[in-house]
A protein has these predicted regions:
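Anion-binding alpha/beta catalytic cores of soluble intermediary-metabolism enzymes, centered on
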Residues: 1-265
Length: 265
């Protein structure tokens, strides 16, 4: 199929077999530098993202798929949000709970906390906060055709016992989820959770308490396949689970599989 360049969204013919590139530069001469964060590249990213979200909000498009953003470029370009999910939720007027999902080989993960300092994590581990991603990942997986998904829940502390959060918050959240009919199991100690849940195929998904407890396992097992799904929004939005990979930019050696996987989801 041919790639056509258009200057407005209205020029796109969705019945055509061709692919369309929407040029939003409007004559601007952005000065990009390969493998280097710049104010101009950040502004360009935000402009494209804002337009995509606007089109989604107006029901003119059904989904958004994007390549990795460089967070430094976004900040230089004027982004004031802590992460992309917060930005997207705000622009789409979503007030309910949102959560970033990561996927490898149809194994999904969700987090209770995300981009916050480790020292702040424990205070956020409450029964109510744990139930939110459990409910959401169950809902989203069922929408993706996985009925009654087997949900593993990670512990917070080493061996699920060096602290009180498991007894006071995590186990009560798991028990409450079971009362709601959700197929939950845990808490699983973090250091073996991916072997039990993912490698041994005992679960379909896993909810973790903080960012690196999940991301380290995901990237160890499937860095070259991982997908990120922005959960809880009004439109499906996906990207790769890896970053912008400036270390290999321009070398023509990038692996396309993660981006293709994110597009398929």
């Amino acid at each position: 199929h041919e790639l056509e360049t258009v200057n407005s969204f209205e020029e796109i013919d969705f019945k055509s077999k061709n692919r369309f590139f929407l040029d939003i530069s409007k004559g601007k001469n952005y000065k990009y530098k390969i493998a280097e964060p710049t104010k101009e590249s950040g502004e360009s990213i935000l402009e494209a993202l804002y337009l995509s979200l606007k089109l989604a909000k107006e029901n003119k498009i059904d989904a958004i798929n994007f390549a990795p953003f460089n967070k430094t470029s976004l900040k230089l370009g004027g982004n004031k949000y802590s992460d992309e999910l917060q930005l997207m939720a705000d622009k789409l007027d979503v007030k309910s709970f949102c959560c970033e999902f990561n996927v490898i080989d149809n194994f999904w993960t969700a987090r209770v906390t995300s981009h916050i300092p480790i020292k702040e994590v424990a205070s956020q581990i409450t029964k109510e906060n744990i139930l939110k991603p459990i409910k959401l990942i169950n809902e989203v997986m069922e929408l993706n055709g996985i009925k009654n998904p087997r949900i593993a829940v990670q512990a917070l502390n080493p061996h699920a016992e060096f602290g009180t959060e498991e007894k006071d918050e995590i186990i009560p959240a798991i028990e409450e989820a079971k009362k709601l009919g959700l197929n939950t199991d845990g808490p699983l100690p973090c250091d073996t959770s991916f072997v039990v849940a993912y490698k041994n195929k005992n679960h379909d998904c896993m909810v973790g308490m903080y960012h690196d407890a999940l991301q380290s396992g995901l990237k160890a097992f499937g860095f070259d396949r991982g997908v990120t799904v922005q959960g809880g929004l009004t439109v499906p939005i996906t990207t790769t689970a890896h970053g912008s990979a400036f270390d290999i930019a321009g070398k023509n050696i990038a692996n396309l599989e993660p981006l293709l996987n994110s597009f398929k989801i």
